[in-house]
Amino acid sequence: MLEKIFELKLNNTSLKKELLAGFTTFVTMAYIIFVNPQMMAISGMDQGASFVATCIAAAVACIFMGFYANWPVGLAPGMGLNAFFTFTVVGELGYSWEIALGAVFLAGILFVIMSITNLRKWMLESIPFNLRIAMGCGVGLFVGFIGLKSGGLIVANEATFLSLGNFAQIETLLSALGFLIISVLAVRKVPGAIILGVLIITFTGIIIGLIEFNGLVSAPPSIAPTFLKMDILGALDVAMISIIFSFLFVNLFDTAGTLLGVANRANLVNKNGEIIDIDRALKADSSSSVIGTFFGCSPVTSYVESSAGVEAGGRTGLTAVIVGICFLFSIFFSPLASIIPAFATAGALIYVAILMLSGMEKLNWSDITELLPALIIIVMIPLTFSIANGIALGFI
């Protein structure tokens, strides 16, 4: 049955390889089930419900990608867009998280429309390459800034705007240590370096008495506080247009880049150089963002960490289905998710930000007409603390 659905032999893989690849991808992505609920809670959402929503939305998206597109790609709420959701749309602009979810829903609908028409191709080709790269890099700096701030590594200063944090505080030291642990594990190519770093710092906090341990496993919290709570009518406002398109653009280009990278690694390219079933993969991704809002999630997107599973031998959608099953079983670890503090996730945010900045090497530095607006986007997204404003300034 699995052979018929996923064509394992045709793709030169096996059940054993797909299981290993699926688990590898999940381990590299698992940090999101701890980081995302914490981020969403800042916007006013119930953290327990957000944890369950993150797990279920990721599970549904991965399983859908596996069966519909037969691609070895894991999906979950995206880093960067969740920060934009919380700190800009809700925090700075003052919209409720329900209206913000409505904006995510509308952006997802537009993404679906683009995925089933030629609008996607036109959009990808009409925006200069440097600007597409710059969006991801700017979001990376945005995420990194949030990580540095939440970990106490940088603090506000009236004279210099920012200054170094107080390393005499144990929380600040643990934030820096978390980043160091993740970096060392990543350099040594340890699978799941990010989630391991978060857990090590969390258990260190428990040992020294900073965190109260409430167990590892329990029945999952209710998803009712976030389920079907998006305010679509509230998002149908002229002032929300830039926000909706910010969600759309960042998700579109992030997804396109991730899928192209995974396709090359997984040999999902035919003899003519065309990517196999790229349209189905894009439809699965865009639909997942819409589905995620039903549960109460910021935009769901394809994860570049899927490359780790491909390197482990994943070649078909069975890998994605395994990732989805792992996310589904994660809902029973809510006690652990609820005690993970900001200083444990700060290092993860900073490390993910650095990964997102790696795209700068692809910039065309010889064409000043594209380079200047690209650099404006990269710099202004974190400095204005807004993805929408940064992108707008670069395009203008």
Language-model features: locations:
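Membrane-embedded alpha-helical modules
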Residues: L93-I207, I211, V321-I396
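Loop-to-helix transition at the N-terminal end of transmembrane alpha-helices
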Residues: G44-I63
